[in-house]
Amino acid sequence: DPGSAPKVVRSRGGSVSGAMHACLIMVVMVVAAYLRFVGLNWDELQHLHPDERFLTMVETGIYPVEGGWTEYFDTANSTLNPHNQGYSFFVYGTAPVFAVRYLAQWISDSGFQPIDIGIQSSLVLGSRYDQVQLVGRLVSAFADTLSVLVLYFIGRRLYNRRVGLVAAALAAVCVALIQQSHFFTVDSFSNLFVTLGVLFAARALYSDNTVNYACFGLALGVAMASRINTAPLVLLIVVVEMSRPVVGGWRLSGGLRMALAAGIAITV
């Protein structure tokens, strides 16, 4: 039938190409992970990075709430609020700080260490002053490694697999990203959710699925909870909606989808 869609015939060469592509992505991710996780104790517990040192002090000053969500949202009395622990000049986002603090507490309570899963390492993780910064660096390294993978999917969504692979490969060996991933700061953590926001915006460009908008709002919310200067990312979803042709009741439905994204971001 000349009017029917053409059939896609996959050859053996195409499957080999796909397998090779998958192998290349794995190589890129292994390289990215190695460059980010190697040498995490680069200062030998001397706390040489000023921002990291301040965050470490805050982490040892706050501690997880025991009264559930009620105590968590009780700003005046919450044990997680740095302002209640003498750090009234705290200006960083709380999402990475809380994530690291809870993870460090879990490690301390469980006694878990890297050697328990066969990783030969001299790192001692926990919630103490000389331990929590290493937990924070692990979180930064993990977040930045994931950012490389997300960048691949962005390139693949907007262009093709090759562009995604090149973008991921360049990010994997980017000196600035590797450097930041070795610090317990909010940068690598927030960057992960910024890239996730870009990914879901790119997906929304080709599909008006509400899930993409909800995930964009979630990513935007966590990004802003890490660094408030990531707020302009919200303009991206507006550009996506404005790029669509007006069809029927599109403006109303598009507005509702953006309102959903904004509502989730504000809630987070």
Show where each model-derived region lies:
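Hydrophobic alpha-helical membrane-interfacial segments at the cytosolic entry of transmembrane helices
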Residues: 24-29, 214-215, 219, 234-237, ...
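Membrane-interface transmembrane helices that cradle and orient dolichyl/undecaprenyl
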Residues: 162, 197-215, 223, 242-248
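Transmembrane-helix motifs of polytopic, lipid-linked glycan transferases
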Residues: 138-158, 196, 200
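Interfacial juxtamembrane loops and adjacent helix segments
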Residues: 47-48, 52-141
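Hydrophobic core segments of transmembrane alpha-helices in multi-pass, intramembrane catalytic enzymes
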Residues: 55, 144-147, 190-198, 215, ...
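Short acidic/glycine- and proline-prone juxtamembrane loop motifs at membrane-interface regions
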Residues: 176, 182-190
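Short helix- or helix-capping micro-motifs
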Residues: 32, 167-172, 179, 199, ...
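Transmembrane signal-anchor helices characteristic of membrane glycosylation enzymes that use polyprenol
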Residues: 21-48, 52, 65-83, 169-173, ...
